[in-house]
From Swiss-Prot:
Coiled coil: none annotated. Pathway: Amino-acid biosynthesis; L-arginine biosynthesis; N(2)-acetyl-L-ornithine from L-glutamate: step 2/4. It is an enzyme of class 2 (transferase). It comes from Cyanidioschyzon merolae (strain NIES-3377 / 10D). HAMAP family: ArgB (MF_00082). CDD domains: AAK_NAGK-C. The keyword Transit peptide does not apply. This is Acetylglutamate kinase. InterPro entries: AceGlu_kinase-like_sf, AcgluKinase_fam, ArgB, Asp/Glu/Uridylate_kinase, Glu/AcGlu_kinase, NAGK-C.
Length: 290
């Protein structure tokens, strides 16, 4: 049984726009139908979830198999501050001590994960929330950078539970928390999780929804989005990107090098950017290909 979308979502679109969108989208729908796409839902855009959820459900109605990986950094910081604990970073990565790890797990695997699952289901979808611990989906190990504390790296991925859910037309929603073989809980970088899952699942596309419109040629001009890059061009960005864009671009490069057909970085704060990027010729964000 395919996902059933809330009819109100379609009614919001004018007749002329419906025809235009469907005509342009049809070749892309035919090409990607039944293919897996991994969408990384950045913590900075979680508050814009209503429109993004509609886009995700539209894609599932078209037959795309969607896997969602989410972050939640801003909300983690809010909870840390409520407990009078200041967020700590080392080389741009969150330092995760035992108390911080408990908050990270509570926020990501609890609040944010269930919020997204609830939103999808309320709009007629069928979502199930997971974290790396569930069915040993992701086995973690300690980072080689001891300064980071309980920040982990991916040791193994066992995707069978995702395969089972996709076969039954569910949308897996995954929080980036996992345990090691000895049961220690680790905080994983959600960008890395999304990229590695895309490779393991043999996804055709990896999509990052962020608070910027894409990869910018000029960091001071938000409209200077680079539409398409090959791997060589993406690797040459090392000196022009910074902060949270670095792990996203690196994950895109790794995914494309390992069989993912295309990786996208797009803005999540404006309506329907996901559909415009995937189902139109012009697109809206940045796409990295071989």
């Amino acid at each position: 049984m395919q996902q059933q979308i809330n009819p109100e979502i379609i009614q919001e679109i004018s007749d002329d726009l419906r025809v235009q969108v469907l005509t342009e989208a049809l070749p892309y729908i035919q090409k990607w139908r039944n293919e897996i796409m991994v969408i990384k839902y950045g913590g900075a855009v979680v508050k814009q979830d209503a429109d993004i959820i509609k886009d995700i459900l539209f894609l599932t109605c078209c037959g795309f198999q969607i896997v969602v990986v989410h972050g939640g950094g801003p909300l983690i910081n809010e909870w840390l501050k409520q407990l009078n604990k200041s967020p700590q970073y080392w080389e741009g990565i969150r330092v995760t001590d035992k108390v911080t790890m408990e908050i990270v797990e509570m926020v990501l695997a609890g609040k944010v994960n269930k919020q997204l699952v609830g939103s999808i289901n309320a709009n007629g979808g069928k979502a199930i929330g997971l974290c790396g611990k569930d069915a040993n989906l992701i086995v973690a190990k300690a980072s080689s950078k001891k300064e980071l504390g309980l920040v982990g790296e991916i040791e193994q991925i066992h995707p069978q539970v995702i395969d089972m859910l996709l076969e039954k037309h569910y949308i897996p929603v995954i929080a980036s928390v996992a345990a090691s073989h000895d049961g220690t809980t680790y905080n994983l970088n959600a960008d890395v999780v999304a990229g590695e899952l895309a490779i393991k699942l043999k996804a055709k596309k990896l999509i990052f929804l962020t608070d910027t419109k894409g990869i910018l040629a000029d960091i001071n001009n938000e409209n200077s989005v680079i539409s398409t890059l090959n791997l060589k061009e993406a690797k040459n960005l090392a000196n022009t990107i910074s902060g949270g864009m670095i792990p996203k671009v690196n994950a895109c490069i790794c995914a494309v090098e390992n069989g993912v057909e295309a990786a996208h970085i797009i803005g999540g704060k404006e309506k329907h950017q996901l559909l415009l990027e995937l189902l139109t010729e012009k697109g809206r964000g940045s796409m990295i290909v071989v």
